[in-house]
């Protein structure tokens, strides 16, 4: 009997260890505040003022195309650009009268626009990606090489210089009869690490006495919660909401000269953002997206021979007998009834219900998204939809 008893003991030990680990995990989750599960980091819902990207643009030429470039008769700017580039390189292509030679008709050159994004705190010598897009009637940029092109900012200064081979996501194939097949967009491409930063943006953070936090979705409640979270962390009245989209932080004495450390600590704080009740519908694709706080007031709906009645009945929920925790609360029981017969009268809805409950009732009948969009627009027109309806 003893060997069997020892085997049973060895089998029970891992089970006890798992139960103990599960108990510790449950206790740990129970100690965590409920807000932490729905909270987001400040860095995920806001930006720091001054820390942003900058747009760059440039004009250049792509060469080396396989007879898929611009036709110089239809794109005179390509001819002028090619002429100016060759003259700067010491190549004379003008006749005795000074006019551009009519024999200059290459098919492997295309005029393009270059766009790029300059990340914040980019230093000289770092590389950034650039996008290349055809301007003329070029059919395909695949295999072409972008010549040296300066990229300028909104202030007219050159911040980067781009050059390299263009990679496209499409292609064009044509036959002798004139028929062609195009896949993707062969007239737009990308050059990974195709530009070198030549000028840095002048921005110094160490001397700042205050920092502003810019919310990506401005909201009064969210900005106040961010200020409260920062003040709770710093232990003083250092942050205040200026408007729904801005929270101003005064740099504490302990962070003077170390603003980067302050922003590092602040962006890790968690805040539960508040959202405005909104319903977004896309009539083209039939997509419906709704927020959590969407509610419907008293309304009766009928579409053709379809009648929907929504009622809510309050019920009392009590904890089990001899329970140490729990309170008696009142909950709403929702009842959705749908009649498809003719001759039914509209029923008045006496209480507010969520839009999700209404949509679930309609979906159970197989009503398509486009009919749902029509119903939602009618509810909004009646003033019963307590949310913003945005139609794309």
UniProtKB/Swiss-Prot annotation:
It is found in: Periplasm; Bacterial flagellum basal body. InterPro entries: Flag_FlgI. GO terms for cellular component: bacterial-type flagellum basal body, distal rod, P ring; outer membrane-bounded periplasmic space. Keywords: Bacterial flagellum, Periplasm, Signal. GO terms for biological process: bacterial-type flagellum-dependent cell motility. Residues 1-38 form the signal peptide. It comes from the Bacteria. GO terms for molecular function: structural molecule activity. Pfam families: FlgI. The basal body constitutes a major portion of the flagellar organelle and consists of four rings (L,P,S, and M) mounted on a central rod. Assembles around the rod to form the L-ring and probably protects the motor/basal body from shearing forces during rotation. Belongs to the FlgI family. This is Flagellar P-ring protein. It comes from Paramagnetospirillum magneticum (strain ATCC 700264 / AMB-1) (Magnetospirillum magneticum). The gene is flgI.
């Amino acid at each position: 009997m003893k060997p069997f008893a020892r085997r049973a003991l060895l089998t029970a030990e891992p089970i006890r260890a798992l139960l103990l680990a599960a108990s510790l995990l449950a206790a740990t989750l129970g100690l965590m505040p409920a807000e932490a599960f729905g909270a987001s980091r400040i860095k995920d819902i806001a930006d720091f003022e001054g820390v942003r990207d900058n747009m760059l643009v440039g004009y250049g030429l792509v060469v080396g195309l396989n007879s898929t470039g611009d036709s110089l008769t239809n794109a005179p700017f390509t001819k002028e650009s090619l002429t100016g580039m060759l003259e700067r390189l010491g190549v004379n292509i003008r006749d005795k009268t000074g006019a551009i030679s009519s024999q200059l008709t290459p098919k492997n050159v295309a005029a393009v626009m270059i766009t790029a994004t300059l990340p914040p705190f980019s230093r000289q010598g770092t590389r950034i990606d650039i996008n290349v897009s055809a301007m003329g009637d070029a059919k395909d940029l695949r295999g072409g090489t972008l010549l040296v092109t300066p990229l300028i900012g909104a202030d007219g200064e050159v911040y980067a210089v781009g050059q390299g081979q263009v990679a496209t996501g499409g292609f064009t194939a044509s036959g002798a009869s004139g028929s062609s097949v195009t896949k993707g967009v062969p007239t737009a491409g990308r050059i990974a690490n195709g530009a070198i930063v030549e000028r840095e943006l002048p921005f110094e953070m160490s001397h700042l006495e205050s920092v502003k936090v810019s919310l990506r979705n401005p909201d009064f409640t969210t900005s106040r919660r961010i200020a409260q979270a920062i003040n709770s962390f710093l232990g003083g009245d250092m942050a205040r909401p200026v408007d729904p989209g801005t929270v101003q932080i005064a740099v504490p004495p302990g962070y003077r000269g170390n603003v980067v450390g302050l922003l590092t600590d602040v962006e890790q704080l968690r805040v539960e953002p508040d959202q405005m009740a909104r319903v977004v519908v896309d009539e083209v694709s039939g997509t419906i997206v709704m927020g959590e706080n969407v509610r419907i007031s008293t309304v009766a709906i009928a579409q053709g021979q379809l009648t929907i009645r929504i009622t809510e009945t309050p019920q009392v929920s009590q904890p089990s007998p001899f329970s140490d925790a729990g309170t008696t609360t009142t909950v709403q029981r929702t009842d959705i009834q749908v009649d498809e017969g003719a001759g039914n009268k509209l029923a008045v809805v006496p209480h507010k219900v969520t839009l999700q409950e209404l949509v679930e009732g309609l979906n159970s009948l197989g009503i398509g998204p486009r009919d749902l969009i029509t119903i939602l627009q009618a509810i909004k027109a009646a003033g019963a939809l307590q949310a913003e309806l945005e139609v794309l």
